[in-house]
């Protein structure tokens, strides 16, 4: 009963949000709206600065490794196994996979800022 109530509530809420988004007026972007505003003056230069692809790749790599560590920390409590050796083996396998991934990134020069 509890599961059915939760599913019904979630489906109703999702449908309600979809209907609200459908009926709300759409805002349209036009040339004046998307141009940068600098205190009423004409812009001196382009507001669209080039984005460093190296920074983006390092940031994505950091996020992946950070999420893996965040998943590794609560592993003993999440598994709740009676066999401690199994938990230690799984944690060691995950750490080994992370170390191999880091070594691969290092060898491929994925962590270098300047070439």
From Swiss-Prot:
Look up the signal peptide feature and give its range.
none
The cellular component terms of Gene Ontology attached to this UniProt record, alphabetical and capped at eight, are: mitochondrial inner membrane; NADH dehydrogenase complex
The record ties this protein, via InterPro entries, to: NADH_UbQ/plastoQ_OxRdtase_su3 (IPR000440), NDAH_ubi_oxred_su3_sf (IPR038430)
One Gene Ontology molecular-function label: NADH dehydrogenase (ubiquinone) activity
GO terms (BP aspect): mitochondrial electron transport, NADH to ubiquinone
UniProt catalytic activity: a ubiquinone + NADH + 5 H(+)(in) = a ubiquinol + NAD(+) + 4 H(+)(out)
What does the record say about its membrane topology?
Multi-pass membrane protein
Where is the chain membrane-spanning? 3-23, 55-75, 87-107
UniProt keywords (A-Z) are: Electron transport, Membrane, Mitochondrion, Mitochondrion inner membrane, NAD, Respiratory chain, Translocase, Transmembrane, Transmembrane helix, Transport, Ubiquinone
Name the enzyme group at the top EC level: translocase
Q: List locations, semicolon-separated.
A: Mitochondrion inner membrane
What's the main place this protein lives? mitochondrion
What are the EC numbers?
7.1.1.2
Cited function: Core subunit of the mitochondrial membrane respiratory chain NADH dehydrogenase (Complex I) which catalyzes electron transfer from NADH through the respiratory chain, using ubiquinone as an electron acceptor. Essential for the catalytic activity of complex I.
Fill in the subunit field for this protein. Answer: Core subunit of respiratory chain NADH dehydrogenase (Complex I) which is composed of 45 different subunits. Interacts with TMEM186. Interacts with TMEM242.
Q: Which family does it belong to?
A: Belongs to the complex I subunit 3 family.
Record protein name field: NADH-ubiquinone oxidoreductase chain 3
Q: What is the lineage of its organism?
A: Eukaryota, Metazoa, Chordata, Craniata, Vertebrata
């Amino acid at each position: 009963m509890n599961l059915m109530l939760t599913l019904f509530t979630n489906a109703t809420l999702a449908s309600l949000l979809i209907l609200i988004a459908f009926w709300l007026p759409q805002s349209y972007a036009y040339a004046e709206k998307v141009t940068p505003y600098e205190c009423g003056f004409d812009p001196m230069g382009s507001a669209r600065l080039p984005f460093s692809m190296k920074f983006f790749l390092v940031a994505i790599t950091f996020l992946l490794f950070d999420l893996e560590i965040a998943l590794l920390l609560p592993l003993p409590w999440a598994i709740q196994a009676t066999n401690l050796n199994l938990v230690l083996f799984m944690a060691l396998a995950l750490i080994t996979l992370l170390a191999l991934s880091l070594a691969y990134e290092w060898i491929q020069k994925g962590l270098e800022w300047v070439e």
